[in-house]
Amino acid sequence: MSIPKIIHQIWIGSKTPPTKLMDTWKNKHEKQGFEYIRWSEDEMKKRGFISQLQNKIDDMIEINGKADILRWELLYEYGGFFTDADSYCMEPITYLVEKYKAFAGYENEQVRNTGWCGNTDQYDDVLARTHPVIATGTMAFPPKHELPRLAIEWIKNNDINVDRTGKRAWRTVGPGLLTRLYHGQVWNDITILPSYLFLPIHVTGCAYNGREKIYANQEWGSTKQSYDSMNLVELPPHLKEPTDKVSILISSLNTKAIYIKDCLDSIKNQDGHIFFEIIWINDGSNEINTKILKQMLYEFENTTRFVKVIYSENEGNKGIGYTLNKGIEMCSNEIIIKMDSDDIMIPNRIQIQLDYMKRNPGIAICGGQIAMFRTVKEKVINVTHHPDISWEEYKQKRLHWFINHPTVCYRKSKVLEAGNYDKNLKHMAEDFELELRMLKTHGFIKNLPNVLLWYRVHPEQVTNGSKTKDKGGAHSQYWINIRNNMINKLIN
């Protein structure tokens, strides 16, 4: 049985609810086809919901403990996703509900990991010395699931009053109970997710700053006793959508899955608070490679924050010139990062180039150096050292290699001003020809001294002639002559 598309939140009592936060869940999910239920005393009467644990709810002193008890009953009866009232929704949870049979998340793998209480036996009731704490602020189950049933039975048969037990609600009916029940037997259908998905900032201040998807931010209202000011809460800056935005342009033709994974991982591992629009064009890959690529991009977009993937397929193999011309037009941002599907960016590549382009608005295009490798990127076989170059210098030197195209960062308006990629150049020289036209049109190309990319050298790449075997690789006489003709045409 799957998790129903229902969002449950509870607000009981006479205090003003944190509607600003609660509405984020309603607004993000109703348009995704979810039913949103805000459980109050009136809503329970309206729906005819009668708690089988009302005596325990009445006996529970802590208001958050009363909500803890109710959540178990609601999840057992209806199934769906429960989240606390002090949680701010940033992304709809559709992907998680469709992927997992049931799930919850850790409280924090650093602060509340195994042994978080030291060697004391004070918290043995919540398995503190042997297991990390599992949070109850976000949980999802199908209806009538065994774990919520066991929680209800435990609460029914045990004393949960703090005055008599000396144990707060989090230990008896909240995270402590979930942690005990989860580790009390093997659950093949329950996944415990990383804490950062719903608790990116722990109450202690321990924060997650990576690029994995974050669905919500917890305000810890009960712990901080801050519900009275909850409707004034704003997301911290590093959780808000970035104002800096770039497009990343990538094309592929039957690229190996392991290379694509390395490429995508290097995007996910980028430093900086930057929104990435990824334009990925499939230039005629076969059926199985297309299926693999689409699945990898789907998983990447749904597990990475501050990213949008725009995928397009050509009708057959149109060639790199056609594909990149199309890709430039598709980019919605002025700053475009070029990348090959088989390469690996260094972690601060985009931040370095974006900072440079922002400081130098007159620069149309900038590249950087590459570290070449064959199988393991740590085993570098060569590093380039391209300097800056002007059009006047170029006319004297007539170089065939003066910028590393996979490291290029250019302004869309300047690429279009120079005429964009030539659609008729199918393989090999399309990058060189555009670089020449941009150099002539704008007068200067900046080559940063930084290594920005690990460049994979392998037999299948275009540079080695894998797509032009009758004409050889980039250094064959055929392509040397082609480039010389391009140079002469532009100079003369």
Task: Place the predicted regions along the sequence by residue.
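Short, well-formed alpha-helical segments that are part of the catalytic scaffolds
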Residues: 15-26, 255-269
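A conserved acidic beta->alpha catalytic loop
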Residues: 43-44, 282-293, 316, 340
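Glycosyltransferase-associated regions of secretory-pathway enzymes
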Residues: 1-67, 83-240, 355, 487-490
